[in-house]
A protein has these predicted regions:
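Conserved SAM-binding loop
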Residues: 61-62, 80
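Non-catalytic interface/targeting segments
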Residues: 1-43, 47, 51-55, 75, ...
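Short, glycine/polar-rich helix-capping loops at beta-to-alpha or helix-loop-helix junctions
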Residues: 65-70
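Short acidic/polar active-site loop segments enriched in Thr and Asp
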Residues: 58
Length: 124
């Protein structure tokens, strides 16, 4: 599996839509085994989501992200982990620790949004 982080250099970008690059971490048996940095592409979000799905990305870590962008990932079964700052690798390690020990998710999606039936709401 892979985890994508929206970055500015080696740090989690403050704003998802202003990220300079995505860092993709390959994880095997809970251990980071590879890291690749890709420039942030100037293509529509659905194309990025399709690319991430083809690369087996299961989570996107970012700081701030607008709900429309987050929905693309959520609808593709890519977990969005928002409100994260600091060094990208540290964020991935913390995500893995929380996931592997069964702690609460940093961000989860509620499928029962009363305002918009059938849509997902991010709860931090």
């Amino acid at each position: 599996m892979r985890i994508a982080v929206a970055c500015s250099g080696l740090d989690v970008a403050y704003r998802f839509d202003h990220a300079e690059n995505f860092t993709l971490y390959t994880v095997t048996n809970g251990i980071i085994v590879e890291c690749q940095s890709l420039p942030y592409p100037s293509v529509p979000q659905p194309a990025i989501v399709d690319f991430f799905k083809s690369m087996d990305v299961v989570a996107l870590i970012c700081n701030t992200i607008n709900i429309e962008d987050a929905r693309y990932y959520c609808n593709a079964d890519i977990e969005v982990v928002a409100a994260v700052s600091g060094i990208a690798r540290t964020a991935v390690e913390q995500y893995l620790t929380k996931t592997l020990i069964g702690a609460d998710e940093m961000c989860h999606w509620d499928d029962d949004d009363d305002d918009f039936p059938g849509e997902h709401t991010c709860h931090l």
